[in-house]
Design a protein with these regions (language model features):
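N-terminal subdomain of nucleotide-sugar transferases
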Residues: 1-61, 106, 251-257
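Conserved catalytic-core segment of nucleotide-activated headgroup transferases in glycan assembly
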Residues: 22, 208-280, 288-295, 300
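A short, active-site helix/loop in glycosyltransferases that binds the activated sugar's phosphate group
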Residues: 49, 120-122, 166-202, 394
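Membrane-proximal helix-turn-helix segments that form the acceptor-binding/catalytic region
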Residues: 97-102, 138, 150-183
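Acidic donor-binding loop of glycosyltransferase active sites
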Residues: 300-314, 325-327
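Short hydrophobic beta-strand element within catalytic cores of glycosyltransferases
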Residues: 318-321, 328-332
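Conserved acidic donor-binding segment of nucleotide-sugar-dependent glycosyltransferases
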Residues: 347-354, 362-367
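A charged, aromatic-enriched C-terminal amphipathic alpha-helix characteristic of glycosyltransferases
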Residues: 365-398
Length: 400
């Protein structure tokens, strides 16, 4: 089978300035008899050396599509102009007649579109079987954001969400509902929300493939004398509210001496300086790593990952990485959404920060029990978020 892929992002083994890892790992898992030609706008700005490396690793041909001059011009000089548009600015991107002719004349068996905003490009190729990987429903993201009190408190964030929400709604209402196009998302609620917006659409939830797994696999046995706890990811909008609440609880906990005795905390990512300083001042052993050259190697040095995500859609890649590599993940509902794990069987889910503290108190006394949860989590991810399995499901849509 020959597939032509058109993508806003250049695939990469890890997310580089965008969601570039998902298409990479779907391509890694494909049947090797499937020939893929990729046309990419390379909005995540990979270098020529990186692009050549990706082409070799994935055994695909890659052609760069020039980003339209008007897109660059408006983003650079007239960014506020976007407020007046009915749709997100990237949704106005279309293939030129020569680009379209090249793809049509190549006569692929199917077209694979990556990036929600490329729906007009998809429509230009409406005579082909198509799969459109979104991978998230952006209108759901803004809908959720507008329902959060912390978003309303920040005027810039609130008005951005208020302006972007109807733009994505307008775009998604216009999605093609023909029988020869399937939409692929990595969130169950994303699919449900999209089906409400656009009745009749063929939208499907496929689990997000996990990324890298350390070799040899990490031995799941909590460190002694102190258990190593990791906070991974930048301190940003997605973690801000719940991370602040959790740090406050750690500092003000009546069990402070017990928590200090049994744990060492590491923050991996930028923006955590204030939290590290506050925990150190409270007597906790705390470390800060702003960047790890080998991310998987670094996370495997730890036993537990706490993920206090308070907003978002789809699947969180760093949570998948942690569980797949044998860490016990303690996270919020948003952190664990769409991941094939269950509370107290293969992960720990908490609602309020004080619940997380309760589990941290219990873990040192029942190490074996919580190690078994981490073991079950890894087993579930490796089986149900398997690259090959999910890639087979995706490419099957291209034959229907």
């Amino acid at each position: 089978m020959k597939v032509t892929m058109i993508s806003v992002m250049m695939p990469a083994a890890e997310n580089i300035r965008g969601t570039s890892a998902l298409p990479y790992h779907l391509l890694v898992g494909r049947d090797k008899s499937i020939e893929v030609i990729l046309y990419s706008y390379n909005l995540n700005r990979l270098s020529k050396e990186q692009i050549d490396s990706v082409a070799r690793e994935l055994n695909i041909k890659i052609y760069i599509l020039p980003v339209p001059w008007w897109y660059v011009f408006f983003l650079r000089f007239f960014s506020p102009f976007r407020i007046l548009l009915n749709y997100p600015i990237a949704n106005y991107i279309r293939l030129s007649s020569s680009q379209l002719d090249t793809i049509i004349n190549d006569n692929p068996d199917a077209i694979w579109i990556y990036g929600e905003e490329l729906s007009r490009v998809s429509h230009q190729l409406k005579d082909f079987r198509r799969v459109h990987t979104l991978p998230d429903c952006e209108s759901l993201y803004y809908y959720r954001m507008l329902g959060k009190r912390f978003a309303i408190r920040n005027k810039i964030r609130f008005w951005r969400s208020a302006f972007m929400y109807p733009k994505y709604l307008n775009m998604e209402k216009q999605f093609d509902t023909s029988s020869n196009i399937h939409y692929h998302l990595v969130g169950k609620e994303d699919v449900n929300f999209l089906k409400e917006i656009c009745p009749g659409i063929q939208a499907h939830f496929l689990r997000h493939p996990h990324y890298q797994v350390a070799k040899p696999a990490k031995v799941i046995s909590f460190s002694s004398p102190k258990i190593k706890v990791l906070f991974a990811g930048q301190y940003n909008l997605y973690m801000q509210q719940d991370a602040d609440m959790l740090i406050d609880c750690l500092i003000k906990s009546k069990d402070l001496s017990e928590l200090k005795e049994h744990y060492v905390y590491t923050f991996l990512g930028k923006g955590w300086d204030n939290h590290v300083e506050r925990l150190n001042n409270a007597g906790y052993e705390t470390h800060h790593i702003k960047f790890a050259p080998d991310y998987i190697e670094e996370i495997c040095k730890h036993d537990i990952q706490i993920t206090p995500i308070c907003i978002g859609t789809g699947t969180k890649g760093k949570v998948l990485d942690a569980i797949a590599n044998g860490l016990l993940v303690i996270g919020t509902w948003y952190a664990l959404e769409n991941i094939a794990v269950k509370h107290l069987e293969s992960c720990i889910e908490y609602g309020e920060a004080k619940e997380c503290i309760k589990f941290l108190k219990d873990i040192p006394a029942r190490r074996n029990y919580y190690e078994s949860i981490a073991l079950n989590g890894r087993k579930s991810i490796l089986e149900r978020h398997n690259q090959k399995l999910i890639s087979e499901c995706l490419f099957r849509f291209m034959k229907e």
